[in-house]
Regions:
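Multi-pass membrane proteins that catalyze or facilitate reactions on polyprenyl-/lipid-phosphate substrates
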Residues: 1-180
Length: 180
């Protein structure tokens, strides 16, 4: 049930990409993301898993993942935070968020691929494809290390570290918006 809201959200992917051009919009989304990540640490934790989690809670977590089409919003962080608010065990919520993250990335690849096909493959060369394949492989290896680090950080400190990072980045983006 978590994947259901994510797939339709990516039909809005092309519409929301223009928000990334506005530093003010990005800084506001980063402030919102920091709040989404920070607030759940003050709520009681639960121990729900697949046996006790309702479909509504799964849909709510999926809506958090669907919010990742907005620049500055972390889909995985939003899913885990919403799951935590609903009483889902953080570790279980993180594992599900990672699984849904694969669907999110697949939808992104499909949308970007459709954009390339609509453009008529102009400028696509073998060296460009090879570069993208190597970059994809390197990002896969980096993601594996990142997942292990993320699991350890969430288990020990929740998402408060990432919330402060988002707020600092939001202030920096807001400052750049004022200067530009």
């Amino acid at each position: 049930t978590m994947v259901i809201p994510v797939v339709p959200a990516y039909f809005l992917y092309n519409l929301t990409q223009s928000l990334g051009q506005s530093l003010l919009a990005v800084s506001l989304m980063l402030l919102l993301n920091g709040a989404i990540l920070y607030i759940p640490q003050f709520l009681p934790t639960g121990n729900k898993d697949c046996r006790t989690m309702s479909r509504v809670e799964g849909l709510l977590m999926g809506l958090g993942g669907a919010a990742s089409v907005l620049p500055g919003i972390s889909g995985i962080g939003a899913m885990v935070s919403i799951g935590s608010v609903c009483g889902v065990d953080r570790k279980y919520a993180l594992e599900n968020a990672m699984a849904v993250g694969i669907v999110i990335e697949a939808c992104t690849v499909v949308c970007d691929g459709a954009r390339v096909i609509a453009g008529g493959f102009g400028g696509v060369t073998f060296s460009l494809v090879l570069t993208y394949l190597c970059a994809g492989f390197a990002s896969f290896l980096g993601a594996l290390g990142g997942v292990k680090l993320l699991r350890r950080i969430v288990a020990e400190h929740s998402f408060s570290v990432f919330a402060f990072y988002c707020w600092g980045l939001a202030l920096f983006a807001f400052f750049l918006n004022l200067v530009a």
